[in-house]
Amino acid sequence: MRRAALPILLALLAGACSRGADEDAARRLPGAGAGDAGEPAAFDFERPLGALALDSDDVSRRLGSFEWTAGVEWSVSRQGDDAQRVRAVERHRIRQSATGDFDVSADVDPGLGPGSDAGKEVIRAGGMTYARAKYAPWRERPTDRGRDARRFRDESFSAPAAVLRHCGAVAATPAGEATVLGRPARRYRLSLAAAGADAPAAPARPAGAPEPDEDTSRRLAFLEGRIPTSLDGELLLDRSGAPLRVRIAAAFGVRDDPRVRTAVELSAQVKGLGGEVPAILPPKSPLPDARKPAGVAGALEAAGLRKKEEATPARAEPGDEPAE
């Protein structure tokens, strides 16, 4: 069972941690738009799920500096003589400054035992990106210009939206008011818009692509055949439309294997605001970027080309942001 269920679990983690092209579509949701960098657009509370399409920069324009955490637990179980359960956990944390600097970390424990967990942390401070893998030293990333750092941050921050995408049509029903961090908030109850509604279809396999192997076939079976069976949750929105707290508990079946059940629980919340959020500072004594093989660097230096290379500004890669 563990071999059968684990690919499904990894498919879910891949879908949740790599938000992909759906981000652009999500940001076009009604109610999600933002104005220029100084003034966010008025939020449309008739479409509260649009709040989950706001990125971290959008939210900081509405709330100022903030600290945010999220935990996501995925589990896959299968009934029968070989019944077993596989579990994985994601943990995310973001500190976002109103100045645009940020610190983000993401960890995944795939449930495979000691040493299987992995993670990454990225800091964007003072126009420089710094990154490290879990247990590794900090390194500078001078060629990033913030693009990859922001993508990594936004993948974490969009975790609630990614989970709800697996659920298909979702209803958000007004459920009164609450107070979060001393701020008034509107509460919405989350549920499936129609019982047993199919989730969006997975992208079609490219023409001419080779037949998938056994594990890939299991992943595709879930992504293409998942059936949302239940959803219970709540969404609390600030008066500006920024999401202050999200809770989601959802379950899925698989069309071609009724013995398989997948469940996910997510809890995300803003933990601090304004002066409660520590300043975003560069890490102490980061190492230089070492992604260029040492042998290549040595050969350039020996040939007298390294100084010239360092003196000439690097050409921006396609899609890079302007240097800051």
Task: Show the residue positions of the predicted features.
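Bacterial N-terminal signal peptides that target proteins for export
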Residues: 1-6
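C-terminal motif of bacterial Sec signal peptides marking the signal peptidase cleavage site
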Residues: 13-16
